[in-house]
Amino acid sequence: MSLKWTDVLEIAIQLDESKPEVDPRYVNFVDLRRWVVELPEFSDDPQRSGEKVLEAIQAAWIEERD
């Protein structure tokens, strides 16, 4: 499975599994973007991320953690 920026929930799940020590409420977007791009299954253009998609990923990650 290859991940795109639109796969918000799956990205959040993978971040939650790979970064259990991180509290997603306090993640800055620079780190979040880097971690998404570094996911093994991520295959989208790294330059296509924007604030809205990063906010959606962060919100989904917070929800996943709860």
Swiss-Prot record:
InterPro entries: ISC_FeS_clus_asmbl_IscsX (IPR007479), IscX-like_sf (IPR036762). It holds the Pfam family Fe-S_assembly. GO terms for cellular component: cytosol. GO terms for biological process: iron-sulfur cluster assembly. GO terms for molecular function: ferrous iron binding. To E.coli YfhJ. This is Uncharacterized protein PA3808. It comes from Pseudomonas aeruginosa (strain ATCC 15692 / DSM 22644 / CIP 104116 / JCM 14847 / LMG 12228 / 1C / PRS 101 / PAO1).
